[in-house]
Amino acid sequence: MFDSDHNSIFQSDLCQRLVVHSILLTFLVILLCTSLYPSSAFIVGLLSSACAALGTYEMGAMVRIKFPFSFTRYSALGSAIFIALTCLTARCKMCFPEHIDLLPWFFLFFWTIRLVFKSRHYKLGPIGSTGLALFCMLYVSVPIRLFLHILYGFVHTDTPFVGIWWAIFLIATTKSSDIFGYFFGKAFGKKRIAPVISPNKTVVGFIAGCCGSILVSLLFYSHLPKAFADQIAVPWILIALGTVLGVSGFFGDIIESTFKRDAQIKNSSDLESIGGMLDVLDSLLLSTPIVYAILLITQNRTFLG
C-alpha cells in the first residue's frame, strides 16, 4: 500500500516537473535564439534581472532564518540593477566607450557603500549586514552576469550566434545532468552520496548525470553549424567539458542543499513544480563560471569576456 502511494506521488510530481520544465525550456531556447534582436535582448535583460532579484531574495530569506538580516529586499534590488546594467553593457558594448563593462561593478561598489551607512543602527551592524548582503548578491548575480557575457560575447564578430550556441550548450548539458540524475537516481539509486545534506543524491544518479551531460555534448557537436565550426572546440574537449559540467552541476546542487539544510528548509521558495529560483539555478551557478573561463582561454581572440 505504501509503495503504491509512494509511486503515485512520484509519478504525479514527475509529470508536473516534466510539463513545467518543458514549457520553460522551450520558451528559453526560443528567447535565446532571438536574443540578438533589440526586443528580445530587452526581454532577456528583464528576465535575467528578475531571476537575479528573486534568487538573491531567496538567499537573503535563508540568511534571515539564521541571522537578524534586514536587507533582503535591498540586496534583491541591487542584484536586479546590477544585472540590468550588465545586459545593457554586454549587448551594446560596441556602442559605448572602452571599459564600459566596469559600470555594473561601480554601481555595486557604491550600492554596498550606501548599505554601510544604512546598517549602522541595525543589530548586525555595518560589517555583518554588508558582508551578508554582498554574499547574497554575488552568489546569484555573478554567474548570471557571466552567462550574459557568454551569450553576447561574440556580437562583434561575423558569427554573433556563437554566443547563443554556447549559452544553449551550457544550459542543455547542465540541466541534462539534473534530469538524468533525477530519473536514474529515483529509479535505481540506493547508495547515497551525502545523506545528511541531500538525501536524494545517489551514486547512480551522479554517474547518470555525468553520462547525460556527455551525451548532450556529443549531440551538440554532431549538429554544429558549419558556418562557425572553426570557433567551437574539438569533440574531445566538448566531451571533457560535458563531464566537467556534469560534476560542477552536481556540486552546485550540493552547495545550495547545504544552505537549505542549514536554514532547515526543503525548497528555497514555494513556486509550484519548481521549488524556488535557486532550485532552478543551483547547478548553473557553478557551471557557468567554468564555461566562461574556458571561453576566455580557448577563444581569447574573438570572445569579449
Curated annotation (Swiss-Prot):
* Swiss-Prot/TrEMBL catalytic activity: a 1,2-diacyl-sn-glycero-3-phosphate + CTP + H(+) = a CDP-1,2-diacyl-sn-glycerol + diphosphate
Q: Which GO terms describe its biological process?
A: CDP-diacylglycerol biosynthetic process
Q: Single GO cellular component annotation? A: plasma membrane
Q: What is its EC number?
A: 2.7.7.41
List, alphabetically, the Pfam families matched: CTP_transf_1 (PF01148)
Going by the UniProt record, its keywords in alphabetical order are: Cell membrane, Lipid biosynthesis, Lipid metabolism, Membrane, Nucleotidyltransferase, Phospholipid biosynthesis, Phospholipid metabolism, Transferase, Transmembrane, Transmembrane helix
Extract one GO molecular function annotation from the record.
Answer: phosphatidate cytidylyltransferase activity
Q: Say if the entry is tagged with keyword Transmembrane.
A: yes
Q: Where in or outside the cell?
A: Cell membrane
From the UniProt record, give the pathway where this protein acts. Answer: Phospholipid metabolism; CDP-diacylglycerol biosynthesis; CDP-diacylglycerol from sn-glycerol 3-phosphate: step 3/3
PANTHER family associated with the record:
PHOSPHATIDATE CYTIDYLYLTRANSFERASE (PTHR46382:SF1)
The record's family statement is: Belongs to the CDS family.
State the protein's name: Phosphatidate cytidylyltransferase
